[in-house]
Amino acid sequence: MSSSRHFSIPYDEDVVHSVILENTPSPPPKPPRGILRKEAPMKPQRSALKIEPARDDDKENNSQPQARSQFKAKDTMEQMQSYFKRSISVLRKSEEHFTGAEAADILTAYIETHRNEFPRDNIGRSNAVKLLEIWLESNTIQSVESHQKKFVDSERTFYRLGGDSESLYIVNTPIASRNHDDSASVSRSESSRRSNSIKRLFSPFVRRNRSNSRGRDKDKDNLKDGSSTNLKSTWSLFSSSSEKNEKKLKKAEQQLIKEEEAEVYELSLFHLLSLIDVEFLEDVALPVQDSKNNASFLSSILGKVGLGASEERLDPHQEDHMDLLIETHPLIRDASQWFQMARCCAPLLYFEAKPVASNHKTSHNEQLYLWCRAALDAVKNRLEKMTQNGSSPLFPSEFAPLLTKIAQQLINDMDSGEKLSTAVMYIFLMVPHPIRKTIDQLVQWLQLTMRTDAVEDLRSPYYLGKKDPRRYKENVNVIIGELSSFIFPRGCMTNVQQDIFIETLVELRQKGKLGQRPAQLESSLRAKSVNGQIKWQRKERKHNSLEGDLTPVRYTVRRESIRSKTSKSKDGLNETDSALVTMINSVIDNKELSLTEKKKQLMNFKKFYPKLYNDFFPGMI
């Protein structure tokens, strides 16, 4: 049919519809716009993304409409978090911390109970652990240890609930369909209904309805991009500001702890100086009422010792293995507390179920000895590394003059009574808290050693020398002998004095007094917090100090007046001897000279003028 003939027939709609009968086949649907065009389209055509339907969707029987919200997955996440928090509150009524294994158990139980709401691949404990990792990143839960960045499913890792801030959840979902032209709106709505069954976790900070069309208005695109960028930047600012506030609070808390430690150190030193007489304190921080100077002094002591978050630890699975071995092995069961305390003293302590790989069969005594010896070696290696092979012992080298005077005046004095215990309590409180905690763990380990005979002889299972019927005494001596060089400064005490000092520490811990503040110290702290100063209770002696002076008398008046108690008058001396005594007094009172230089000058004076030394400076060296 030609085109001229076609246009010659008039078009009448009624006639056309009357011609088409009921049995006439209907014409095919009109193809989409642009298919039959001969010329190239103005815009490049984009084919729709192929979206596979979900497994539980039925292609043929799609009679039941799906009325799910696009925030269904977000609601599911909120329900999971609410269930998790309720379960934690029921499980831990009085404690705010929970273990990684408990968190994984709770979330796995929820997923198993609501398995119909999750894809088949997302059911199981491994997916619960993955979700807990996401919660840890989004601050829904927080690790107790700051260096723990990854969630660990273990009984030895502890967490706490975080804030209720919005979080960006990242899950593996099919790629979302992109918007097309208006002609594809029907297919897009069907595909969106199918994609609702993916259980995607939505977040208000995820950009949605992004358009790749080049024909959109640039202002709208800029507005959308700007709003999304603002949301993301707001989230980043919120998280960064919260982290900064957290760091500030932690820093302020640490500063308060340091100042409190400095006050305890200062007042403990004052009370200790009322029990012992020390001539030179240049190596010890002078007792001044300045908490900042004392705090910096304690920080310098703590900086010499290798303690902190950088210390190595076992893998959580290895720790679980050690727990199981110590609690269930028949050879270790009776000494399980001793081994657990050894693990507190040496976190890297680890041994296999069969520590000896040799041809001959190991006896039970030998195997237990190897385990006990491995525990002692692990503690020794840790202290050796922590103290730099004893150069920075747990009782700092700066306290050597105090320890020496405690040994000479209290330990050697059989009639010292409670003075020795009180002095040990004061000098223990003067040690910085992290080091004090390590000393307390060692004392507790020795205390457990004294209470059990289940630990094998640490010298040898076949030791043929003289043995004490109570095996623990020999083991205590072995432990003290191998660890004392890392506990005390070198040369400040003899071996016998070190044994008595450690026995005093153990006795104080058995009575519950180790680490506790004596009544006099508590009253001094209260008086200082209320009045800002303390009225020092002086001894019965004559001196020139003021009534409210805090420092003991021998540090508040000139050295000449102190020495005048035991020294003779210079009236009967000739001019030369009087000048020599005055010169030595000026040397002792000179603050610019070091302790070594003063001792050297006194030794030379004693060598060349022994009579003057014995008359005016007895016992100064």
Swiss-Prot record:
Segments of skewed composition (Basic and acidic residues): 52-61, 214-224
Region (Disordered): 19-76, 178-197, 209-228
Knockout or disruption consequences: RNAi-mediated knockdown causes formation of ectopic A/PVM-like neurons.
Transmembrane parts of this sequence: none
Record carries keyword Amino-acid biosynthesis: no
GO cellular component assignments: centrosome; chromosome; cytoplasm; midbody; nucleus
Key words, A-Z: Chromosome, Cytoplasm, Cytoskeleton, Kinase, Nucleus, Transferase
DEP domain residues: 72-164
A biological-process GO annotation: positive regulation of apoptotic process
Function: Involved in promoting a consistent pattern of asymmetric cell division and fate assignment, perhaps by regulating apoptosis of specific cells, including in the Q neuroblast lineage. Downstream target of MAP kinase mpk-1.
Name of protein: Target of ERK kinase mpk-1
Source organism phylogeny: Eukaryota, Metazoa, Ecdysozoa, Nematoda, Chromadorea
